[in-house]
Amino acid sequence: MRPNNRDTILRAAEKLILQHGVGALTLEDVASAAHMSKGGVFYHFKTKDELVHQLLVFAFANFEASVDSMAQDDTEPGGWLRAYVRATFDISAITETESLASAALIAAYFGKDSAVQKVYENAHGRWSQRARNDGITPATADVIRMATDGLWLAEALGASRFSRDRKREFVAQLLELSRHESA
């Protein structure tokens, strides 16, 4: 299926954020990167803040769809949480571009834009609730989810010192922990 104009604009904005950072993002540059007129971009997004807000909504919706898809095959206690861990670190589930763009947006706008902060808080509230109701102890669910989020953010911000092998071990340990802590 061919992406619609709105999705094309959002993908173009993701790429620009990766290339130049959030601070350099302009609607004019997004229009150029999306191969459409400025008016076409303004039809969907009146301001840069609105674009950023919708980009986070878009990224989180794609991520949640990946988690839900992966969780369908794992009906044991902790299955949704294992899907969350896998989707966070599986390049086929969420692209590195989406992951890095989301982190950049969160870092740049968190605390500055209450609408963006609300999107982030709502998503994390949903994920926390699902993790805590996934059939393993709530404390273990919190540890796994927060460790997953912490490594994702460290990687997205370039602060992770894990080798590829160490990352695999870390993820395997989180997955294993989710299998032995039934509520």
Predicted segment positions?
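Hydrophobic alpha-helical connector segments
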Residues: 54, 61, 65-102
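Short alpha-helical scaffolding segments that buttress acidic/His motifs in well-ordered protein cores
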Residues: 84-88, 102-107, 144-151
